[in-house]
Amino acid sequence: MADDQRTQDVGARITDEGIERMRARIGVEVPKEQPWNEYATVDAIRHFAWSYGDDNPLYSSPEYAANTRWKGMIAPPTFVHTTGVSVVKEIPPEVREKGKGALAGVNALFAGNVLECFQPVRADDRLIERRVLHSVDVKESRFSGGISVHNIDRQVYLNEQGQVTTIWFKRFIRTERQRASEKTGKRTVERAVYTQEQLREFDEAYASETRRGAEPRYWEDVKVGDAMQAMLKGPLTLSDVVAWMQGSGRAEILPSRLGWKNRQRHPKFYTLNDFGVPEAAMRCHWDDSWARKIGSPYAFDMGNMRTAWHCQLVSDWMGDDGWMWRLETQIRAFSYIGDTHWLGGTVTRKYVDGERRCVELDIWARNQRDEVTSPGKAIVILPSRRHGPATLPAAPPELEERRPNDG
C-alpha cells in the first residue's frame, strides 16, 4: 500500500486537461487561508531579517531606525511574503470547479521574480494581499525532459491606507517528478567539503563585510562601472534552512493535530517520507531522499531565500537613505546544502526619472563551482546632494484602494 502511494506521489503527469484547468485560474483572486504574520510586528520583521543573515539595524532596532529618514523600523522588501490577509474569502464554486486539480502532484519550482517596491512596510502594519495567476505558458523542459508549464503569479500588497507597498511577480516551473527523477542519476554534482583553511577564509570574508548604513550614498558620487562590495552566503547548512523557516514561515507546515487538519484540506501537499509517514512535499529543501525523487541530487535552498540575499546585497550598498525600486532575478540552478555563494554587482546605468535619481545594477550570485546560479538587475533611487532625499516611486493608480476611513 505504501509503495503504491509512493508511486502516485511521483507519477503525476502534465496533461492537456491539466493545462487548460490551470489556464482557467488566470485572473481569479486566490484567498490566503492564514498568513504567517498577520501584523508586521517589530519581532516579526526582526526575525525575518535575521532568518537570512541580515544584520541591518534598520530592520531590527527601533531605536536606531527612529533616527533615520523613515522615523521608525521598516521591513526588508521580501518580508511581505510572510504576511497579507485576504479580502476575498472564497472562490465561487463554479469557478473553482473549472480549475479543480490543475496539475496536482507535479513539481512547482521557483524560477525567478520581479519585485517592485513603492511604500515601506512599517512596524504594526496589517497588509492586504491580492494574489492572482497572471499567465500560463507551455515550454520544453531541459530539467525533466518533455514539456513544462511556466506560470507567473502576481501578488499585490496594500497597507491600511490603501497604498500599494509591493507588486511581486513570481515565476514557477512545473515539471513531472518521475521524469525529473529519472534524469537525476545522469547529473554529476560534486558536493562541497571544506578545509579548515577555507573556513578561515570565509571567516575573514564575513569580518571584512561592511554596510553603508547611515552614511548616504549620493547619486552624484556613483559612477557607471563601480563595483558593489562582495557578500558571502554560506556554506549553506540545514540549520540555515531552519533559520529561514523560523523567520519566513510556512503556515502549511504544521505538526500533530494541526498537520492532520491541514492534510484533510490539502492532501496533495503531502507525500510519504522514507518512514511511510505523510510529510509536506516541500521537504525537498531538507530531505535528500525526497529531493532525488523530484529531480535534484541533494536538498536545496528556497528561491525566496536567494531573493532575500539579493535584497541584502542592494540594501548594504545603497544605505538607509536609498530605496530599492525594482528587483528582477532568475533562479537558474539549485543551491544545494553545502554550497557557498558570493554575491556581487556593478553599476551599469545612471539616469533621471522625473524627480528620481536612479541607478541600475547588474547583480549575481556565484557558487563554489563558479556557476552563476542567480543573475539579476536592480533599480535603486538614491538621495541627491543637489535635489535632496530619494523620492519614492508612484504605484499604478488602478491598484490603489480607497479605505472606509479615508473620509
Please provide the spans of the model-predicted regions:
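Ligand-binding pocket scaffold of soluble enzyme catalytic domains
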Residues: 171, 175, 327, 344-351, ...
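Flexible glycine-rich active-site/ligand-binding loops centered on an Asp-His dyad
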Residues: 145-158, 168-189, 379-384
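Hot-dog-fold acyl-thioester-processing enzymes
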Residues: 2-112, 177-321, 385-407
